[in-house]
Regions:
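Short, Lys/Arg-rich, polar N-terminal cytosolic tail immediately upstream
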Residues: 1-5
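Short hydrophobic alpha-helices at membrane interfaces in multi-pass membrane enzymes
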Residues: 152-171, 206-207
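Transmembrane alpha-helical segments
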Residues: 84-95, 142-154, 185-192, 267-273, ...
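Membrane-interface micro-motifs in multi-pass membrane enzymes
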Residues: 105-151, 259-262, 299-330
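Intrinsically disordered, polar/acidic, low-complexity terminal segments
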Residues: 8-50, 54, 64, 68-87, ...
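Signature aromatic-anchored transmembrane alpha helix within multi-pass, membrane-resident enzymes
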Residues: 286-290, 334-359
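Transmembrane catalytic cores of multi-pass membrane glycosyltransferases
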Residues: 23-78, 130, 173-299, 306-315
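Alpha-helical transmembrane segments
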Residues: 8-23, 107-114, 166-167, 208-215, ...
């Protein structure tokens, strides 16, 4: 009974974190390149061709294809939740060098999880997009797991060679272009440090380093990378110093600013060390050195992107990972120092992050519920148009309501030919719609004529779909109050052969509609 009581808070904490991620992914439709990688399939031949002609990310590409192959929203949601939790867990456990749960983790785990959510440079595309997560969450999970084992081997002076760590080393090296070079660099620096300290090097570190370097070579030297680069003359045609200058002056600062909340969390923890003499005397200096080192590596992962013609926000997830490690090292050192001010300080920062997380999460949940409703509308249009024999048609783009920031949006990239291939037609185009049309899926239906149907809910969303273009005004009875809305003031869009109109009419039930 006592054992059960001890593990209950830990289980509840992990379960809540799991459900938080699971629920958002449950409401997330497959989108963007998810369709492309589903069509890619899981055959070795198709992935070899992909490697030779497009991308060296064999680990990420196979991960996304395997997940999408299931065509199961349950699998998608579980994979998103598990990958996020395991990623955060390795971040939490690296400073201690053990995977066993200890007292400090009751504060450290929520601190890292909350910070991962509220400071993520592009949460929608790194966590809730299957292909994006495969490229920037799963691969970074392999990297941080490798860092954990490599760090543990170093501090415990372990000599054993593990085939699993060797495989993990290769996977970490073959992660993504911003992080992979630093995996190889860290492994080489670890060998150099041991050689300097002991005048000899453990064979396991040599093996793991060679595996990591091999993974980096497979990733970076992919023929597909060179084929893609051949079409980027606007970038590669410039002298290298010009590319570096443009990157440093126009791109780096904007991308580093994306994770500003992580800097605030890190600064607050550092201030606890600086301004408390007792903490400075008792804190583990090795943890501070490790924190400084991973910050430098994190900045390096951003600087190295001068080599790439594009620098999407989601790529910053690798940089963000190293700042999370820095937060973990300092917070762990504060908690293990035994100084009350350090423990209280970490607890206070965790509570602050938790408050922001709660606000952000509720916005995200509401927003993704609405996009799930929009997906129902899109699927109905696809079914209807295919049944009518159409080979080319339009679906509305997703519309996001207010989130913490635009980084919460999943990717809106849309390839008409790929969507068409997935649904066995020639092409499916998208059209931008500047209103939330989920009310069409889950609102009350009002048949106004053979050509016109209205939809409403008690939250104030009101939409009309008509085969004829509307003019004049619409009069509504909302909770017994009359409201007149000029049609020209309603938001509108034309989807295929239909005219869509939308207005926010205030909360209440619509009981009557007339033109």
């Amino acid at each position: 009974m006592n054992t059960m009581l001890k593990i209950l808070p830990k289980t509840a904490m992990i379960l809540l974190a799991f459900l938080a991620i699971f629920l958002i992914e449950w409401y997330t439709p497959i989108h963007s390149d998810d369709y492309r990688y589903y069509l890619l399939g899981i055959s070795p031949e198709s992935h070899f061709h992909h490697y030779m002609t497009w991308s060296g990310r064999i680990i990420a590409d196979y991960t996304s294809a395997l997940i999408l192959y299931t065509r199961s929203q349950l699998v998608y949601s579980i994979s998103a939740a598990v990958s996020t939790l395991v990623f955060c867990y390795f971040i939490v456990k690296t400073p201690s060098g053990t995977l066993r749960w200890n007292k400090s983790d009751y504060l450290l785990f929520p601190l890292i999880f909350f910070t991962y959510w509220i400071s993520n440079p592009n949460l929608g595309q790194t966590t809730f997009w299957i292909v994006g997560a495969a490229n920037y969450l799963w691969t970074n999970l392999f990297v941080v797991a490798w860092l954990f084992f490599f760090y543990t081997i170093t501090i415990k002076n372990s000599k054993a060679i593990s085939p699993w760590v060797a495989l993990l080393s290769f996977m970490a090296g073959c992660s993504n272009e911003s992080v992979s070079p630093f995996v190889s660099l860290i492994s080489v620096l670890a060998i150099a440090y041991e050689l300097w300290q002991n005048k000899s090097v453990s064979r396991n570190k040599i093996v793991y380093s060679l595996c990591a370097i091999a993974g980096s070579c497979v990733l970076i030297l992919s023929p597909g990378n060179f084929i893609r680069a051949s079409g980027k003359e606007f970038w590669y045609g410039r002298p290298i110093f010009e590319r570096i200058f443009i990157h440093l002056t126009e791109r780096v600062h904007n991308h580093l600013a994306l994770i500003w909340i992580a800097y605030v969390v890190l600064l607050l923890l550092v201030l606890l060390v600086i301004f408390n003499k007792q903490i400075r005397a008792k804190i583990d200096k090795t943890s501070l050195i490790c924190a400084a080192l991973v910050v430098c590596i994190g900045i390096g992962t951003s600087l190295i992107m001068f080599a790439s013609p594009s620098y999407p926000d989601r790529v910053m997830n690798g940089t963000f990972m190293f700042f999370l490690l820095a937060i973990s090292f300092i917070a762990y050192a504060l908690l293990k120092s035994g100084v009350k001010a350090g423990v209280v300080g970490v607890a206070a920062v965790t509570v602050l992050c938790g408050i922001v997380f709660l606000w952000s999460y509720l916005l995200m949940l509401n927003g993704y519920k609405k996009t799930a409703g929009q997906e129902i509308v899109r699927q109905k249009i696809i079914t209807k148009e295919i049944a009518a024999g159409k080979q080319k048609f339009i679906i509305p783009d997703y519309y996001f309501v207010k989130l913490q920031n635009s980084g919460g949006h999943f990717g809106l990239f849309h390839d008409p030919a790929v969507y068409g291939e997935y649904y066995h037609v020639q092409a499916i185009f998208k059209k931008k719609v500047n209103f939330d049309y989920s009310v069409i899926a889950n609102g009350a239906k009002h048949s106004l004529s053979n050509e016109t149907t209205a939809y409403s809910n008690t939250r104030g969303d009101f939409a009309i779909i008509s085969r004829e273009q509307l003019t004049g005004s619409i009069t509504l009875s909302v909770n017994g109050r009359q409201k007149t809305i000029p049609v020209e003031k309603m938001k509108h869009a034309e989807i295929n052969d239909e005219f869509w109109y939308y207005a926010s009419v205030g909360k209440g039930e619509i009981t009557a509609i007339s033109f």
